[in-house]
Amino acid sequence: MSPNVKKLRRSTLFWRRAAAVLISATTALAVSCMTSRTVDASPQPGARVTATVDGLKLDGQDWWPTGFNAYQLATNWSVNWGCGAMVDLDDYFGSLPPKSLTRFNLFQALAINRFTGEMDFGPMDAVFAAAEANNQMILPVLSPQDGACEDETFKERSWYVDGWTEYDVTAERALMSFQDWMEVAVARWKDSPALAAWELVGEPEPSLCTDAACNWWTRECPTDTAQILRSFYEAAGAELRAIDPKNLITAGLLGGGQCGTGGDDYQYVSESPYVDVVQYHDYGADGVPLPGDQWNGLARRIDQAEAAGKPLLVAEIGEWAGSCESLEDRASHISDKIEGQKLAGTAGALLWAFVPDPRPQECTMDIGKGDPLYGVVAAEAVWG
């Protein structure tokens, strides 16, 4: 690339970012004023969903939510780069039992029009509108740990220190820092009656990459990663709560002993006053309600969540099926798993993952419309 082209690209990106920043200027000023004083860490009254150590409530009634991860809901190929196939939003939300919970990607990259380079909230607004119209609840994830459907870059330790506040002018699929995106997103959708909680990062892990592929078996885990991760939740959480004092914040912890949350560190991070709900993600133990060992297993995480005074949502449960296992057997295994987890004290269960184009002739975790797991979701949900 010639120096002139590089210079032009930098200039174009600068003005794009300047235009994007105008969207959040009022919000940023308000946040600056609010965070100059101490922000109350506890959610204020008024949200539809509330949390205690005993679980979740929706509209004041006990709520043990079930539902799906449907990461691609904001995909619209006529606007953004997408993340999976496009979904008929009314058809999807209309197919669920009322007051189900859906976790989906609300990444900055999906708010950028790939043709104009400008912010375009249309596809995301459509998700909230469809959820509201169909009496459903949603859990938006603001950014992924691994960069999938975003910049494809693994978030290392430095990102959690201060990288989340910095804008990378070379990034094709970003017009602002994560900090700015969080402020824009929260200000825009905080009053939606479909909003259950905010999730800052899916499966956070502030480790260090030692090779270009950042393979998990070669990553390094500095001794201060738990402190770094908790500090991130307290800094970002305070800014989020300054904009939205009512709605819950959930930490999207994988829970299996990852860097920063292994062993006792899981409880330390969970005890942040800006974390209201903790998570566990369950894979590879088909039909086993409480997988894992005495240090990082789900039983240990439930105990730690209780000690921290937080409910624990099993936000991902995945099992392979299709060519390798019947859909009916998978549904039976997951039903048994959820029953056992509910008895052990979890606060809800979300399955991985709904797709509009399932591949029944392959071995996948796809869940399409009409899958027997829809019956499990309906049977296991509790409200009232």
Task: Describe each PLM feature range.
Residues 2-24:
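N-terminal export and membrane-targeting signals
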Residues 29-45:
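C-terminal region of N-terminal signal peptides and the immediate post-cleavage residues
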Residues 46-275, 286-289, 308-309, 321, ...:
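Active-site mouth of glycoside hydrolases
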Residues 281-285:
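His/Asp/Glu-enriched short active-site or ligand-binding loop at hydrolase and phosphoryl-transfer sites
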Residues 290-298:
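A beta-strand-loop signature enriched in Asp, Gly, Thr, and Trp
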Residues 314-316:
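Short acidic/histidine-rich active-site segments
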Residues 360-376, 380-383:
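Short acidic, glycine/proline-enriched helix-loop-strand junctions
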